[in-house]
UniProtKB/Swiss-Prot annotation:
DNA-binding residues (ranges): 25-64
Protein name: Redox-sensing transcriptional repressor Rex
Species the sequence originates in: Porphyromonas gingivalis (strain ATCC BAA-308 / W83)
Family per similarity comment: Belongs to the transcriptional regulatory Rex family.
Role description: Modulates transcription in response to changes in cellular NADH/NAD(+) redox state.
Length: 218
């Protein structure tokens, strides 16, 4: 039975999703501190930098193995190591990308994803002008080879960047080929069976939120 996918792509079901969304903010900040040679940081300083309450920072960090000390704070090097590991950025994940249009091609060009543990191993499309080419050293295949290459490469993560009308059918093909987690960049809420994880990242939805918030500006 298919269900509309929850947006959660949780690393640990015991950790609230809002916490998981904030932890990368903390990581980015302490990485800057670490690069500057800072050895310790307080929850108050982290909170001020990312714009949340200090009590919330302390609560969020209680879910991971980061111990703070009274009047000293958290060891920056420990925070960087623990948060990177907890968020999965130190692990190597391989993914296939489906839909090599403007957005898909841009993601293939983004070598920075490797720094967060994600390697895009191949792209898939139906456009004959794109199939059998390489983008940033990444091969692009016809989507008819999805099942073959998923089995051969043992890839179970898919990035979905196809046009909205093709979103559900492409997701179905991905799942049939063995994809277990889908990073969905389309504005369509795809339906998936139980046991398949979906993370929806619609830029259009975020754009609508920004436009709406701008209306309240003086």
């Amino acid at each position: 039975m298919k269900t509309i996918a929850n947006e959660s792509f949780l690393l640990d079901t015991k950790v609230p999703e809002p916490t998981l969304r904030r932890l990368p903010w903390y990581l980015s900040y302490v990485q800057l501190l670490h690069a500057d040679g800072c050895e310790s940081v307080s929850s108050t300083r982290i909170a001020r930098a990312v714009g949340v309450d200090a009590s919330l920072v302390a609560k969020d960090l209680s879910y991971v193995s980061v111990d703070g000390r009274t009047r000293v704070g958290y060891r920056v090097a420990d925070m960087v190591a623990v948060l990177n590991d907890f968020l999965g950025f130190t692990h190597h994940h391989r993914a296939f990308l489906f839909g090599v249009g403007s957005l898909g091609a841009a993601l293939l060009q983004d070598s920075g994803l490797r720094h967060f543990g994600l390697e895009i191993a191949a792209g898939f499309d139906v456009n004959p002008d794109i199939v059998d080419t390489n983008i940033n050293g990444i091969p692009v295949y016809h989507k008819s080879r999805v099942a073959e290459l998923c089995a051969r490469e043992r890839v179970d993560i898919g990035i979905l960047t196809v046009p909205i009308r093709a979103a559900q059918s492409m997701a179905d093909e991905m799942i049939a080929a063995g994809i277990k987690a889908i990073w969905n960049f389309t504005p369509w809420r795809i339906s998936v069976p139980e046991g398949v994880v979906v993370q929806n990242t619609s830029m259009y939805a975020q754009l609508a939120v920004m436009f709406n918030r701008m209306k309240s500006l003086p």
